[in-house]
Amino acid sequence: MAVATRLPFIPPEATSQIIGGDEDLIDLSQEDVVSDNDDRGNASDVESEDGVKRWTVNPEPKPKKISAKKLADTAAFNSWIEEHQETLARDQRKAAIEAARVAGVDVLPAIGFDSERIITSPREYQVELFERAKQQNTIAVLDTGSGKTLIAAMLLRWVITGELEDREKGLPRRIAFFLVDKVALVFQQHSFLTKNLDFPMEKLCGEMVEGVESKAFWKEALEQNEVVVCTAEILSTALHHSWIRMDQINLLIFDEAHHTKKDHPYARIIKNFYIDEQLERRPRILGLTASPVDAKVDPRRAAAELEALLHSQIATAADPAALQHTICKPKTELVVEYVRGRPDSETVLNKQLRKLVGGQELFKKPLNFTTSAASKLGTWCADRYWQLFFKQEDIVKLESRTERDLMKVAALDEITEKHVKQVREAHELVNAHTFSPAALDPTMLSSKVIMLVRILRDQFERGVGAQRCIIFVRQRNTAMLLADLLQQPEIKSHIPSIAAEVLVGGGTTGSSYVNAKINFQQQNRIIRKFKLGEINCLFATSVAEEGLDIPDCNIVIRFDLYDTLIQCIQSRGRARRPDSRYIQMIEKGNYEHHSRILRAKGAEDVLRKFCEALPEDRKLTGNHMNLDYLLRKEKGKRQYTVPDTGAKLSYMQSLVCLANFTATLPHPPETSLSPEYYITTVPGGFQCEVVMPDASPIKSAVGKVHLSKGVAKCAAAFELCLALLKAGHLDNHLQSVFTKQLPEMRNARLAVSSKKKTEYAMRLKPELWSVRGVVTQLFATAFVLENPDTLGRSSRPLLLLSRSALPEVASFPLFFGTKRFSKVRCVPIPGSVQADDTLVEQLTRFTLKAFMDVFSKEYEATAVNLPYFLSPMDGGHGFDFRLAKSPAHLIDRKALAYVSENEKVPYTFLEPDDFFQDKFVVDPYDGARKFFTHHRRHDMKPTDPVPDGIVAPNHRAWRGLGTTHDILNYSNSLWSKSRGFMIFQADQPVVEAALISTRRDFLDDTLRDEDVEPQQCFLILEPMRISPIPADVVAMLLCFPSIIHRVESNLVALDACKLLGLDLRPDLALEAFTKDSDNSDEHDAEKENFQTGMGDNYERLEFLGDSFLKMATTIAIYTLIPDKGEFEYHVERMLLICNKNLFNNALEIGLEEYIRSMSFNRRQWYPEGLILKKGKSKDARQRHVLADKSIADVCEALIGAAYLTGQEKGSFDMAIKAVTAMVKDKKHRMISYGDYYAVYQKPTWQTESANSAQRDMAKKFSERMGYKFKHPRLLRAAFQHPTYPSLYERLPSYQRLEFLGDALFDMVAVDYLFRKFPAADPQWLTEHKMAMVSNQFLCCLSFHLGFNKCIATMSPSILKDIAEYVTEIEEALETAKQEAINAGKTADEYSRDYWVHITHASRLPKCLSDVVEAYIGAIFVDSEYDYSVVQNFFNMHVLPFFEDMHLYDTFANKHPVTFVANMMAHKFRCNEWRSFAKELDTDVTEGRGGRGGNGAVAGEISEINPPKVVSALLVHGKTVVHAVAASGRYAKSAMAKKAIKLLEGMSVEEFRERLGCNCKGVPMEVDGGVPEADVDGEVHGTAV
């Protein structure tokens, strides 16, 4: 057995393990039982000098017996891994990069990293641009997808913050305008901003707002909003009418600013209104564009004119290549030529229609288009257009449109009728036309279209992984026809994997056969389908070139060539994936096409040179500049010399040193991490904050103020290097020792096994019985039945008298048959009895007589030997014990005296009939035969045969040959030899009696009537002994073994509580120590070796205690360790709450002895220490076998019991005391709840004066959430993402508050479920808690509370993910409300589980759930650790979603692993399948070289870098699907999702044929979980 020793910690070798919880790892070692003579070992609370406990791991188990089938599957799995190493390495890289992206980490592709090259993060450009925009009007020229909108959002937040400060000073109100060029962009930008900024905001475009042209409207807009997103035309009109003035605007943001030219509304706003305003009253300007050029003009001239017109300066990247770390240019650019189509390709159908309806206005544009399309697209496309045109709208609508067109010109009725008739004839003509199926035939399709199909076929066939393609066309009809063409069977057969859709603008054209407008919601729905892969090919018009947020693609095709440089740049910018291709289609021999490409390339070169020629102060350097020059003045000033080695750290060298250190941090393959530098302007110059990646032990540092940005950057790096050196993360040679200096025990195997078992001593009797000796006074406890009638005969309470008063013991049920039970109340009687010799002697005789007559145990003992005494009570079960003044008045002294004076009741054969009623009769020769008499039978004599149906006695003589089966022989149980010496009176009375059941265990709730029903019989009393103990007392004495067993179990549990200093409620104390099966901890498994009649086991209390333990230790760590990061917090908490710690501490205390693991034993309930003269001896075994994990679980159950005990008084103190006793660590020495806040020291950042924006945020939250913050800065910190520089508001990120809030929310959810569902088992509670605390729900809750608008982040990917998620959940909510209305309910009665079905769940923006938990942590801290505010939050905002918990009954079962298990077991009925998970070797995931891209040895960083685990589904020895992830849990989940996708649509027959399944169809039992033997193969991982 593992014990604590003072050994250095040695990381364990990789062994088979499975994840067993948030903090623990469960060892799948062999289930073996080891006898340990030293039950506690040397498990002392050993701490090293640094306060970290040192434990050895469990000893290596004996080899586990594995079936031949599993060995074969394991060998097949390992062989498959060896054969597919390259595939697995590629999958792992993809998984790592995707995981980083989902987490909001801007992962940089790895490049050659050396000490001379300092990587500049793309965020630095954004920060620098933001800082510049704060100082002056700026035009941001950055590539498509580089986060320009993020900069706009940051600037809006900064401007509004300043605006709030100005209003407090009494200045007039002003608002910001975000101007766009297209209506669709109004909706998109407003949607993005409202989802990421918590300010009132309006969207305006001419077609959606009535009354926009009025002074009243604009007055209201000005008063109620901080931002207006609108088309430029609307603002221009409002300014023209003076409904709003330029001095009422504080910020103008021009999206796609290159449109500012000539008479464009952008230009009119500047020329007509901005210029006329006084300089100091003008708003700030921010222009956003990918290129300042939008026409066929000299780029230098166009850029200069744009700067002049917008009164701004262009700012662009000095090193555009740096931005390509995140903005990937196409890997390949191709130009593909096609042959010009014949100009005279007009089709016969087109000519017929032109002749018939060519004169009508309705058909002019369609005819022009089809004439052109016949040449450019092919004859099939031209004719297909008419088929769609007349199919799309019925004849009645076409006739109506014709009539409307003629009404405009006041045509005569005859003309109108003629035109309508022509339309009808055209419709008939098209319907009668024979349309040929599409084919790749030059007579049907143009060379251009055939070339497009070939390109698509080539790209989709050769591509690996998901393909995303955008094809740019000039006209919407072209887009629609091409998309339709790809759905034709012949064409689809060439590209079966393609799923095409059209993305066009919101306008309409007369030539379009689709006349309905496409709104922003429809566009967004198409884009989301494109992102999810439901669509993988978009035919798009110019709407997709700029503005719309379209996911990255790997194939971009210009079917119709661009006209301007900006179109070229923007369409090419859509190809941002690393493997992307940009393909331009040009006509062979077309000089104009060739020259257009050359002009675009030339203009791009000129533009680049123009940007390069900009003054240095106009370039975004990312804080990377000529540091040699800047640092000459610093020489000899700030540097640090390591005393031991003489190594010197200077300002310049600190950048290199920090970069090299960062390179050693764990990171996804093929990527590099880099420090993030954030420079802000402060009084006296510039100050920089450096923020390290999450894996760094020190997260950030702030440098001193300097006059230049470059030196400020060095200063920050210098400070962080000093901090790393001080903490020991840099060695004396300034080299990283990071892998050796991570938090100790981070990878320790801190779980204990549920299979590894050991034998321990077991306490059978409580400490109370150890007090023996002379009796001076006695305390009484009455055992009373609440429903005595269920016993089946008359009874009365029994008194137990002891030398010390029994503590209050919980009531419990006794079972007397089917549906017959009664609770036993253990009533302590006030006062005591002064014990005189006579009373003591009578009690002793009665007690020993009861043991002898009722239980056939004759003891040699005196009063000094007995731990307790029994006495009948003078009174019934209904006695009001409040009237009892002293135990002496309740003792039936008369009965005691009679029993004491009479060994048996005298019998003369002459007694009257009433003598034979209700006597307790004992067979002195057979201890199993005891009877209750009913009455005398005058109609029977001893020699009469025993009537039929009477149960035969068990003695040998009755079964012998020649024995007469009469009443006399039935009554005589002597052996054959002795029977001859006995002569019985032949005419003595026969008595009808009942043979009493030998059952002693009435705690078993499975008892049936036949198990305990007395058996009718007929006796003579001469061979018997009539006991002096009254029958009603005997009836209660028969229950006494069960009663005393439960009472002693309770007293033993209370002894353990006393040992810990805990005053627990007795029933909860017993429940916490009750283990009724070998696998009590496996809630969803069938119980092994189940012990009946033990009452409630510890499972529910453990579930509750686990959460409280997590909460209590979390609060302690948050309070006591304010200067560490979230990672260190998790490690610290893990060391406190891990099962290994609880197990070791329990052994040290000796709790294993007190655990109740055995049910009632009829041999062990008797008092100890008595000499047995007659009767079967007691079972001497006093040891039990316990799993290590069971002992740890009891510790958590004790905490749960303490929590419930304390809650009766509304106090946490008892539970806090229990936590302290269980964890035994200096980081948790609190003994009352008040101790937490008593040692909490408010950090300076919390108590500093809040600015106006922070106060405004607190005010809004007070109105919205119902809690008013005393410290608004605490609220703001709860929404500050780690990517947001702390320098901006001098606040930390939300990570520490999230760590705290997570535990608080978990506790309040568990507490609610525990109380709401008192009969629910832990498995049910756990599954439903999963729904309540899942990220999936918390993201939904965050949306409902509007938290998504408040997150401050510098990551464009996070903002994008938030916007996409909010769009999706808004649609899901709207759908749920509509479903409620359709069902006859109100919209507010929608089903609250709508969030479960959101498809975005696989890529949830985790920051949304994080800020919910951080907010909970913030209100808890702000309220001075008032837990009620957390409960109020839960009741107000969470409970409405869970009023009907049955909505979430299947939430846990929807886990993909469980789903696959059920599918294999029940649908396919396959028994030969197995799910494996195995950690991959480093050389598999990192490449055979064994080193990462930055030179760090992979093995060195593997100590903290999450292991690379492959999970695979094997069916009949064949690998069907696989997935790679950072842990076994995630790998299994990913693998299961792939398996579901593969198997869901597969029939049983197809499954058996494809996978070679020949199982006989016996379904496996899978119920809400996964069979361990079949799913948990080899899993390797770490404890963290």
From Swiss-Prot:
Where the record annotates domain DRBM, the positions are: 1458-1545
Report the superkingdom from the record. Answer: Eukaryota
Describe how expression is induced or repressed: By double-stranded RNA (dsRNA).
Chain ranges of the Dicer dsRNA-binding fold domain: 654-744
Q: Which residues form the Helicase ATP-binding domain?
A: 129-310
- Co-factor requirement: Mg(2+); Mn(2+)
InterPro entries referenced in this protein's UniProt entry, alphabetically:
Dicer_dimer_sf, Dicer_dimerisation_dom, DSRM_2, Helicase/UvrB_N, Helicase_ATP-bd, Helicase_C-like, P-loop_NTPase, PAZ_dom
Please name the PROSITE patterns in this protein's record.
Answer: DICER_DSRBF (PS51327), HELICASE_ATP_BIND_1 (PS51192), HELICASE_CTER (PS51194), PAZ (PS50821), RNASE_3_1 (PS00517), RNASE_3_2 (PS50142)
Instruction: Identify the EC number(s).
Output: 3.1.26.-, 3.6.4.-
- UniProt GO BP: defense response to virus; regulation of defense response to virus; siRNA processing
What this protein is called in its record is Dicer-like protein 1
Protein's organism:
Neurospora crassa (strain ATCC 24698 / 74-OR23-1A / CBS 708.71 / DSM 1257 / FGSC 987)
Q: Which gene encodes it?
A: dcl-1
